[in-house]
Amino acid sequence: MIDTAKETLFLSDDLLFYTLEGEGELIGQPSVFMRLSMCNLTCIGFKSEDSPNGCDSYVSWSVKNKMTFDEIFQYMEDKGLINRLKVEAVLKITGGEPILQQKQLLKFVEALSEKYDFRPRIDFETNGTLMPDLKWVDDFGATFTVSPKLTTNGDPESKPDVLCYHANIQSCFKFVISKAEDIDEIWRKYVEDDKGINLENYRIWFMPCCGSREEHIKVAVTVAEYAKQMNVNFSPRLHLLLWDKALLV
């Protein structure tokens, strides 16, 4: 029996909120974002007017929001988020790097399922450096949006076993593109690689590197043309286009 009064998670400053998925394969779908704090990477290259330190999820840096499962459930009830999930909104678990807390997350989702008598649709946003527990797919039918960091963003040591796993389960691979050289790197490391990743084009999404609506307008067409040339998917940053820099929308 899971003690929901004692088990905890660390959440970012924006906690949980309802919105539309803004990026990748599930773009436009109703989603309840659960943003966890803490990350195992330091992204140095994603610099824009809105993220000068290089991270596009800087709200996940705080580790002060330690909440019990009961506190999270109450917050979700107060915000109407449980009802959203019951009608098939996606539970988008993001960060930071959510797999850092996956032991607790497995308990949390199991407790949520028992308490409210349904299992939510789950999609993770992950950097692809930590192996997910097999239970996520086998028991919960979770999907994954993988966003590997390129040289532009600090290029952490590759984890081919993790990336091969995601390629095999047909995860969405989303790459932030800032220049043409990024595409050569993607093809060398992930498509025509010698480590067995060998991504298929239809599982790849190119997304512009930007932090505001104005920046998006400037660079999106170029990245879209790259996607056309390489026969891969293009993902805008829908939240920037609709709401610019606003949070919790």
Regions found by a protein language model. Name each.
Residues 33, 90-92, 172-174:
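Short aromatic/hydrophobic contact patches that present stacked aromatics
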Residues 13-14, 21-31, 37:
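S-adenosyl-L-methionine
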Residues 23, 52, 163-165:
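Short, flexible, solvent-exposed loop/turn segments with mixed acidic/basic and small polar residues
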Residues 24-27, 44-47, 247:
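Short, glycine/acidic-enriched capping/hinge loops at junctions between secondary-structure elements
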Residues 7-8, 30-32, 202, 230:
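A generic secondary-structure signal marking the coil-to-beta-strand transition
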Residues 3-16, 30, 41, 45-142:
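Conserved Radical SAM active-site core
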Residues 99-249:
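Conserved AdoMet/S-adenosylmethionine-binding subsite of the radical SAM
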